[in-house]
């Protein structure tokens, strides 16, 4: 059943899209000889190569951990990875819907609108990934015990070590797969990913024998950091990220505030259920309040949208 559900989820959307093609393509007048398949082959080959590299890259740490150490540590590591990826999915949800828009603006040479959308997207990524990263560091014990049970306590530190990848992958995903890809700079994404894969492999070779799944977590965090840095440097000519814009500085200020708040709550209540519940609720309230005080564009837009929905 699991295999059937997985396959259906993967290909189901494509099957429905095939039937919807009839609204856009006239199959009665369709002729194969009119297709210029070769002009699509090279871009598709780059995507194929990138997917292969990413597939090897994301599974390398788990394979090496099981080969060098044992399956028990793989289980601890896998638990931390799964929760981290679930949290990361919240941030990455925006990227999927933005790629067609980026591609359209780039193809029509609307570079001013392209840059404005890119700046806004990067700011959104930073504004969402930073508090999630901090939350994952503080809430790792509660999350591991909630979803995996007390037997997976060794997964807690691994999850905390890997928490920075939420920020790194979110930025590199938006910059690489959306912005640079839309600009036709797929090679930069491929080079960056290859460098990350090599660094990950080398670090795993040195760290896993001594530190086990913690070493794998360190290797993954450093590798993802290097992917992001290399991508930013190589792509700077085509798009430069303004990390210290007024909007982004607001996110740093708000994130620093919730760090102090969580440290205070942790000292007051200890690491338990009360800290978990109060920490999440108060962090969300404080974070949004600071953004509202600083007149953050996303909060203002959300407020306007809610008012319009209520009074509509």
Located regions from the model:
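Hydrophobic alpha-helical transmembrane segments
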Residues: 1-23, 43, 194-199, 213-234, ...
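Interhelical loop/hinge segments that connect adjacent transmembrane helices in multipass membrane
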Residues: 3, 15-58, 97, 101-116, ...
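Alpha-helical transmembrane segments
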Residues: 25, 176-184, 232-246
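Interfacial/gating helices of multi-pass transporter permease domains
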Residues: 36-50, 65-85, 117, 150-159, ...
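Hydrophobic alpha-helical transmembrane segments in multi-pass integral membrane proteins
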Residues: 50-55, 201-204, 257-271
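Helix-loop interface residues and adjacent transmembrane-helix termini in multi-pass membrane transporters
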Residues: 59, 68-71, 182-183, 210
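Specific pore-lining/lateral-gate transmembrane helices of multi-pass inner-membrane transport
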Residues: 76-193
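Membrane-proximal transmembrane or re-entrant/amphipathic helices at the cytosolic face
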Residues: 264-312
């Amino acid at each position: 059943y699991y295999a059937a559900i997985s396959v259906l989820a993967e290909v189901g959307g494509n099957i429905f899209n095939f039937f919807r093609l009839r609204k856009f393509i006239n199959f009665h007048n369709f002729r194969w000889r009119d297709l210029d398949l070769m002009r699509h082959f090279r871009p598709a080959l780059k995507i194929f190569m990138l997917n292969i590299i990413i597939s090897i890259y994301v599974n390398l740490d788990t394979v090496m951990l099981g080969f060098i150490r044992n399956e028990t540590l793989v289980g601890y590591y896998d638990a931390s990875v799964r929760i981290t990826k679930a949290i990361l999915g919240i941030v990455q949800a925006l990227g999927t819907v933005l790629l067609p828009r980026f591609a359209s603006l780039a193809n029509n040479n609307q570079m001013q609108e392209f840059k404005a959308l890119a700046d806004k997207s990067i700011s959104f990524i930073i504004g969402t990934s930073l508090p999630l990263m901090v939350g994952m560091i503080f809430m790792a014990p509660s999350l591991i015990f909630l979803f995996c049970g007390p037997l997976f306590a060794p997964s807690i530190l691994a999850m905390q070590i890997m928490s920075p990848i939420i920020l790194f992958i979110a930025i590199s995903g938006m910059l690489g797969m959306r912005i640079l890809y839309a600009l036709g700079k797929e090679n930069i994404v491929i080079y960056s990913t290859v460098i990350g894969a090599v660094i990950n492999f080398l670090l795993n070779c040195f760290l896993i024998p001594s530190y086990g799944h913690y070493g794998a977590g360190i290797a993954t965090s450093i590798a993802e950091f290097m992917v992001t840095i290399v991508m930013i440097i190589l792509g700077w000519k085509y798009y430069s990220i303004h990390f210290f814009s007024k909007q982004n500085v607001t996110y740093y200020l708000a994130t620093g505030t919730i760090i102090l708040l969580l440290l205070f709550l942790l000292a007051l209540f200890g690491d338990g259920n009360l800290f978990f519940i109060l920490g999440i609720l108060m962090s969300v309230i404080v974070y949004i309040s600071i953004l509202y005080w600083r007149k953050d564009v996303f909060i203002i837009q959300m407020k306007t949208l809610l008012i319009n929905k209520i009074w509509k």
